Amino acid sequence: MEAVDTENISEELVIFHCSPTMAGLKTGSLFNCPVKNNRTFLENIREMNRRLLPRGVRIVPLKNMGKSVLVYMYRPDRLREDLGDSRARKILAERNYPVEETEKCIVELVRRLEDGEAFPHEIGLFLGYPPEDVDGFIRNGAAGAKCIGAWKVYGNVETAQRKFAQYKKCTRLYWEAFQKHRSFDRLVVRCS
């Protein structure tokens, strides 16, 4: 699979970085998007959301870094479920997130990213990482992981390795399908 070279958000860039989220296998995905024109970028985000929202997926800019933007694609219903987990709520509550409302948690995450003092490692919860792995990463300062893949694993290695393989296969299959002219919209699975 070849790297995507683009100067604004594109279907290729999203597929390259977000296939597991598009397929409904993952709660959310992050990627850095090169941006030359902020206005065009925001128009493209609005247009993409117009197509994604009916399928239960949303894409939002999290942090503008000048020549690039950190972008978050997620499934709001799945995120609400993930952040409702008691272990996830505990991690977020310890960091003063408004745990009762998912959208306000995203606003708080954006604030922390913009603040820039320390990277908010609880971001893993917004990506669907297991709370025990997010907690382990935070508590151990990223040291002592049992396994490393899409994230550092401190809990169940076997389950994580299966997910890593699933995500990798999904990305490969989505990329191949897109290269064979499969519609971007048809690659976004509507989850109930």
Question: What are the residue ranges of the model-derived segments?
Answer:
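Short, extreme N-terminal leader segments that mark the start of a protein/domain
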Residues: M1-P34
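Hydrophobic/aromatic-rich, well-ordered segments within soluble, folded domains that form packed cores
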Residues: F119-K146
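Internal catalytic-core helix/loop-beta-alpha segment
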Residues: E94-H121
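Intrinsic low-complexity, intrinsically disordered or marginally ordered coil/linker segments
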Residues: M1, P20, A93, I106, ...
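A glycine-rich, hydrophobic loop/mini-helix early in the fold
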Residues: E43-E101
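Metallocofactor- and cofactor-centric catalytic cores in central/energy metabolism, strongly enriched
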Residues: R39
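Long, compositionally biased
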Residues: A150-S192
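Short, flexible, solvent-exposed loop/turn segments with mixed acidic/basic and small polar residues
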Residues: C18-G24, I59-K63, V110-D115
